Amino acid sequence: MAKLTKAKRGKNRWIGLSIRDSDISRTELSHLLEARLQGKGWKLFDLQKHENYKVAIIKTTLEDSSEVRDRINSTDDLSTITTSGKIRLVRARITDE
């Protein structure tokens, strides 16, 4: 089967998150995001520790990205830092924070 062209693959958004709990594991964060983002497509890519908090990067569709950001920002323990169509830019921005 032929590979889909770039235009037919759909657009994604990468969202950089800040997590207050510096001891949260990847599994715990996945469960937390599952509860918050029910019905929305997402995938956890990176989870790194900074000074007294952790940062993560999730991938979501362009169509769901606004709703996903709103749901994440509606909680006290999670907040979005940046959003982009390229993971490289999100990684650069969250490491500069």
Show the residue positions of the predicted features.
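Short amphipathic alpha-helices in soluble, non-transmembrane regions
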Residues: 29-33, 68-76
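Short, low-order "capping/linker" segments at domain edges
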Residues: 89-97
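RNA-recognition motif
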Residues: 43-52
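Short active-site oxyanion
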Residues: 54-56
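Helix N-cap motif at beta-to-alpha junctions
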Residues: 59-66
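Short glycine-/aliphatic-rich beta-strand segments at the starts of folded cytosolic domains
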Residues: 5-23
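Conserved short beta-strand edge segments in small beta-sheet-based binding/regulatory domains
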Residues: 77-90
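Short amphipathic alpha-helix segments
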Residues: 23-43
